[in-house]
Amino acid sequence: KLVLADYNRARAEEVQAKLKDKERFPVEWVDAGKQELIEALARKHGVGLIMNACDPVFNMPIFNAAYETGCHYMDMAMSLSEPHETDPYQKPGLKLGDLQFEQAEKWEKKGLLALVGLGVEPGMADVFARYAQDYLFDEIEEVGVRDGANLEVRGYEFAPNFSIWTTIEECLNPPVIWEHGKGWYTTAPFSEPEVFEFPEGIG
């Protein structure tokens, strides 16, 4: 059984109709910002895994609800970052995923698995980089990720590939950089521009 839970119940019902099996894919309304509602649904349906496909602003209530109800957990974007309070363009504050990673030991003690950041990057980019390290190259000096797309969704004039608010936040927050020998540091947004020509057909 897979519970389709959404704040907009009609959208969950659309998915259910496409799947043509109401018993196997029950629909529920949920406010992902309210941990107690998520816990109640998990207990009602005997959920074993919570797959979070919400905007990352809702990650922590969902993540914490999974822990409290003994569910394994997956998300696509990790807990949000926060700039350093006094020196945002030199020092990192709270990095993406810090709030989740700091709970790893207690999840492990409870026998629960949380796979976070399984979207494009981190996520797919990490898998590709590890594959390249293990099977394609003798030595890697740097891994760089560049985004480019010509995404089109029928019926929409503008279609971002993820939450538009998350994309804006990622562009405006100080970029967090890690360098061997230097560790983590930040710089001002757009302060170190790079011109990169994508292959034909992208961008």
Model-derived regions, located:
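Conserved Rossmann-fold cofactor-binding substructure of NAD(P)-dependent oxidoreductases
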Residues: 29-49, 54, 58-62
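Rossmann-fold NAD(P)-binding glycine/threonine-rich loop
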Residues: 76-112
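Short, conserved SAM-binding/catalytic segment
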Residues: 15-25
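Helix N-cap at the beta1-alpha1 junction of Rossmann-like dinucleotide-binding domains, i.e.
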Residues: 7-11
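Short beta-strand element of Class I
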Residues: 2-3
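Rossmann-like dinucleotide-binding core of oxidoreductases
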Residues: 107-203
